[in-house]
Amino acid sequence: MSLDLLSRLKKYIHDEENSDLDSIYAECENAGLTAVVNDVIDTLLLGTSSCFDEDCLEKLFAICSHFADLSSSVRNKVYDLLTSNISSESAILEDMISANATDFTVPQTNLETTGIAFQLTVNSLSSSNQLSVIRSSTNTVKGRKKNPTTNSNWNGISHVNALLDAIITLFQKKLSRVWTTSSERDMFLSLFLKPIYTLMESEINIKNASFRSRLFNIIGLAVQFHNHTTAAETNIIQNLQYFEHLSEYAADLVHIVTVQFNSVTLAEGIIRTLCSLEFNDNDVKGPKQVALFLVRLSSLIPNLCLKQLTQLVKLLDSESYTLRCAIIEVLANVVIDQIHDEAQNEMSESVPATVQSLMDLLSERLLDISPYCRTKVLHVFIKIFDLPIKYPRKRQEIAELVIRCLQDRSSHVRRNAIKLFSKLLTTHPFSVMHNGLLTRNIWEKGLSIIEEQLNSLQPKQQEKVVDSELEVDENLLEDATMIQDDESHEGESHLENSLSEYVDSVPAEEIVKVNLTKRFYLEALQYIDIVEAGAKIISQLLFAKNKSEVIESMDFFVFCNSFGISSSKLYIKKMIHLIWVKGTSDEGNNIQNHVLSCYKTLFFEPPPNSGTNEAANYIARNLISLTYDASLAELTSLEQMLCILMKDGYFSHLVITKLWQVYSYQKKDISRTQRRGSIIVIGMLALGNTDVVMQGLDHLIQIGLGPPGLEDLVLARYTCIAIKRIGKDASGSSNINFPNSHTLCQKLCMLLLRPSFSEEWFGLEEQAIEAIYAVAKHPDELCTNIILLLTKQLFKPSNHENTTSNDDHAMDEDLDDSPEEETLKDEEEIGIRLAHLIFLVGHVAIKQLVYIEYCEAEFKRRKADAERLAVQNSNNPINGQETSEYDLITGTSEDDFSEAMTFIRERELLYGENSLLSRFAPLVVELCSNHKSHNNQSLLLAASLTLSKFMCLSNNFCMEHLPLLITILEKCDNPIIRNNLVIGLADLTVCFNHFIDEISEYLYRRLMDEESSVKKTCFMTLAFLILAGQIKVKGQLGIMARSLEDEDARISDLARMFFTDFAAKDNSVYNNFIDIFSVLSRSAEEQDEDDAKFKRIIRFLTSFIEKERHTKQLAERLAARLDRCKTQRQWDHVVYALSLLPHKADNIQKLIDDGYHE
């Protein structure tokens, strides 16, 4: 009797609460499940020639409906039974179809019964969260809890695979002969396909390659032979939206169906359906799953996606940025596929039309409102231009767009724009010429040669022309009028003869080749223009807030250097300042480490296969070259870098030996800059290891302090810097002291006593004094002798007063210069020598102050050591002499010693009867007081600087002469003096805190100085004092904020750096915002400045106020000012500031809407 499949489905599948099956299963349990299963197996296997026994089927269905509760062995038996049934019935079915039978009732009924049993087993596993047929520690579907009472350790993969193989064999039959109507056939197929889709819901199942392959083959056969396309499309789309892990596997399934089973209908239908879906604003999961599916599908079958592009691009208008990102990646996959197809043919420089249109579409998305989409476009362009393609013009177009992205407001976009720009540089299409270098000078020189070659190949004019027509601009001439007369025929004939002669003399291929080469050079130069423009913008990102941008920028300039970009050296020098970036997080350390890595790559890693000597020469040469044309700031940063590397032991002993060889070479003259560079680097390395200088101490005495140093004062100055590094070890503590009689100390003294009129003498003097205080055992005694000797030299009678009148040689010299000229020369010489003496005295004074503080610290250290030793040796008596020495140290209290040092500093140095400095103090004050009466700027510079140093010694001296110092600062026309005094005032604020309020006012005034160098020095000084907590700021921050819009880029950059650091200190910008705003608004109105500057400053400052609580409070405080605004402009300023704050109450918005009222 034929089984009614529909009624069976309703009874056993659709009825979730089937009490009949539950009661039968209970009976089976009582009878023993294993025995019952064995009976069912025997019965069904023996009755394959007829329909299965109804009672036996009831037991099978009951057991299958509780499949999750069965033991592993029973499960295996059930699946083996189902596999055997399907295989045997499929064989019977095949024989009947081959025999053209018409009655398929028995195999049809038995297969339907087996399908129901199979579906019951899977439904039971699904309801119990045991869908995984592979043993794993986690056998649950994501998001569901595991039921600990169930059998979750079933490893039935082999048994299930056998069943799936049997289903594959079944689906290969001509089932349309058996189930003739589509509804019957679909109902039968669903018995097997629904469990297949259910098994795919398990992430563990789908990850198994062999299992997944069988599932996909079953679905593919159903689509290919049994009209399952529509049902498959529905199931795949539903699964996409419910199961996260199926997104990419579903794409694999569609790919297999399309390629292996020759059915594109399924893929096309799914794409059309997905492109028409609409998602809720809160739905994040749905768009993400669809996006993953489309991206995976486009990577597998890009040609199909190209055909469906009209449907796919609709998603570019979706509100979900996830879907827009997916379509961007889909377009990229299609482009890459098209490029690969073209690569199989001959590579062309022209872009295919399809690729051109797709890349244009991608370029448009660089204007997408979402930064994620803009970033995705840059990502895909990186993938595209990583391919071996040329497309020089398209590259230039993209490069120009990337330059715009470098200025994007999103750091993610900027960072990836740098990556793309680096990719465009490293894969540029001009590598066939000049070894791939993009050095402008090389290409310009090559272009000029090509143009000369092209001019030589051009036909020479044989017609005689009037001289006045030789210089006619050909752009002014129009084409010849087409009039057929004798003259025109004659001219044409002449031209034809000329061209025919030229064609005979020059091959046409040669002209074409040269013209193509010229075009190649022109395109290369255009590309170089774009790279240099991008490099200029990227250089601004070296100091960005986002650390990833900084690292990408550094890598870009390393690439630029390797490709010979002319401006790269400038930016690499700028990059070295990042060595100072500190941070408690890994980001700060990463930046410093990355700077070191970049510089190692650029300068300190010799070419491969270099010998030891060649490698040392390479490193030493590059170390010296880093000092060429370097500014003071660059040298300071280089010093920090080399100190770090030296402490890490990066430079070998041979490299240091090479540096000393360059410094001490005397067989022939060498470059001054090279010798200077060697000692500069040696001095820098000595910060990390003082042994570097000690290694060449004799060379320092012979070269830097000998004749070469006397001829080159800059060399002598850097030699003194290296010498003073001897006195400090890497930790900064005292290390080595030489007796005053040592050759080194005596050479330093002789250097200071040597007269000189060079401008470099002041710098040499300063460093020589510091070297004496660093290495001499008693530096104060040496400096006293130097000052006395210089004073005697200066004030002793001049030679011409003591010479006799009958000295013929002297008379001859007197005849050369008039008495007036000689007097002027003597006055100028005396003024310079006096300036040197005054400068030396001032620097000795400040170093003596440091020396006194060092003595005080050294006393305290020795006293502590003595006390510790006394305790340790209390049980071990020592001889009387040692005890007496300890008593001498410990007998004096620290307070007494400190008071003695303070008295010396305050009363002895500048006021003591026997003090040498006290003799010069009145002279310095007199020179500064009468600075208008003489025109010697060097003397005034030295005197004012020495005055500020003297003031640091004594509080009384400072109070007495502070008005004089401020007068010079306010009225002096020399910007160098004003610079020095700004720094001097900063030193006074550190030395004497009670002068801060009085001094700070004059410091802030220098921010409005007419000289930009003074403003820069003042801003740096104030920034240091504020960040160090030496000055408490109030309204003065508004004056500093105006520097954000200074015309000098150096000052505006400093201002940005200052406010960035200032904002990180206890919400400082928020706390002072109202004061800053008031100053800026008032100054903008008083000076009638453009409000654009005011708005840019306020926008920059509000970017530091991020906390919601602060923005609300600040909005309330600003809103309270609206009613107090006296002018429309003031009101507009407040409203603009409020517009920048995201949190505003309704009452504030109402005040704004009401507008300004007088």
Curated annotation (Swiss-Prot):
Please tell me whether the keyword Acetylation is annotated for this protein: no
- GO terms under cellular component: condensed chromosome, centromeric region; condensin complex; cytoplasm; euchromatin; kinetochore; nucleolar peripheral inclusion body; nucleolus; nucleus
Q: What GO terms are given for molecular function?
A: double-stranded DNA binding; histone binding
Task: Name the InterPro entries on file.
Answer: ARM-like, ARM-type_fold, CND1/NCAPD3, Cnd1_C, Condensin_cplx_su1, Condensin_cplx_su1_N
Name where it mostly resides.
nucleus
Keywords annotated in UniProt = Cell cycle, Cell division, Chromosome, Cytoplasm, DNA condensation, Mitosis, Nucleus
Q: Where is the composition biased (Acidic residues)?
A: 810-826
Where, subcellularly, is it found? Nucleus; Cytoplasm; Chromosome
Single Gene Ontology BP annotation:
meiotic chromosome condensation
Renumbered to this chain, region (Disordered) spans 800-826
Q: Which domain of life is it from?
A: Eukaryota
What SUPFAM superfamilies is this protein classified in?
A: ARM repeat
Known partners and oligomeric status = Component of the condensin complex, which contains the cut14/smc2 and cut3/smc2 heterodimer, and three non SMC subunits that probably regulate the complex: cnd1, cnd2 and cnd3.
Q: What family, per the record?
A: Belongs to the CND1 (condensin subunit 1) family.
Q: What does this protein do?
A: Regulatory subunit of the condensin complex, a complex required for conversion of interphase chromatin into mitotic-like condense chromosomes. The condensin complex probably introduces positive supercoils into relaxed DNA in the presence of type I topoisomerases and converts nicked DNA into positive knotted forms in the presence of type II topoisomerases. The condensin complex probably also plays a role during interphase.
According to UniProt, the name of this protein is Condensin complex subunit 1
Organism, per UniProt? Answer: Schizosaccharomyces pombe (strain 972 / ATCC 24843)
Gene this protein is translated from: cnd1
